A protein has these predicted regions:
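Mg2+-dependent prenyl diphosphate-binding active-site environment of isoprenoid biosynthetic enzymes
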Residues: 1-199
Length: 202
């Protein structure tokens, strides 16, 4: 929505695209919670914890379907953008599940994972706003790049929150990624550190 200020903010398509992005985001959270076996989401019981994995997965699928239905009215370019974003979301999840391959640097691999899983969705959200409001091509491309970088930064900050915050502050169970062995910026940097106090976190 903020990106639409670079064009005509009054375009109804901008609002519809924002709904598409939020539905897509929510769908990925349902699926992520199943894969992570997360008991909480934003401080409340997760869907998979309350209703089971099957219902949580199907709910995520339903949200993807509703997003696709809305997209049909936004034109082929919007549909293509969403399809490519969905592709990156899935690729990011696959890369995270498989881990670094063939001696790849774990930190570089992790950055590529969050670029696909989080950066792509941020970038697409901003691109929709700029594109559908009629902003110039130069502005659309610049904002898309900016959105991806903001998405990566957001995820890196979230990694720190997972370690450093209390449940009443973040709505999350602290140390979830650490306990489950999920590589994050924090754990990857600690593994490279030499200080004894850092090694205690591993």
């Amino acid at each position: 929505l903020l990106a639409a200020n670079y064009g005509n903010m009054g375009e109804r398509q901008v609002i519809e695209a924002a709904v598409v992005c939020e539905l897509t985001h929510l769908a990925t959270l349902y699926h992520d919670d199943v894969m992570d076996e997360a008991p909480l989401r934003r401080g409340v019981e997760s869907a998979n914890e309350r209703w089971g994995n099957a219902v949580a997965i199907l709910t995520g699928d339903y949200l993807f379907a509703k997003a696709s239905d809305l997209l049909a009215d936004l034109g082929p370019e919007a549909v293509r953008l969403q399809a490519r974003t969905f592709e990156r979301l899935v690729i990011g999840q696959i890369k995270e599940t498989q881990g670094p391959q063939n001696g790849a640097d774990p930190l570089e691999h992790y950055i590529s994972v969050i670029a696909d899983k989080t950066g792509s969705l941020f970038g697409t959200s901003i691109r929709f706003g700029a594109l559908l409001s009629g902003a110039s091509t130069q502005v659309v491309e610049a904002l898309t790049t900016f959105g991806e970088e903001i998405g990566i930064a957001f995820q890196l900050a979230d990694d720190v929150i997972d370690i450093a915050s209390e449940t009443n502050e973040s709505g999350k169970t602290p140390g979830t990624d650490l306990r489950e062995g999920v590589p994050t910026l924090v754990t990857l940097l600690v593994q490279k550190a030499d200080r004894p106090e850092d090694q205690k976190l591993i």
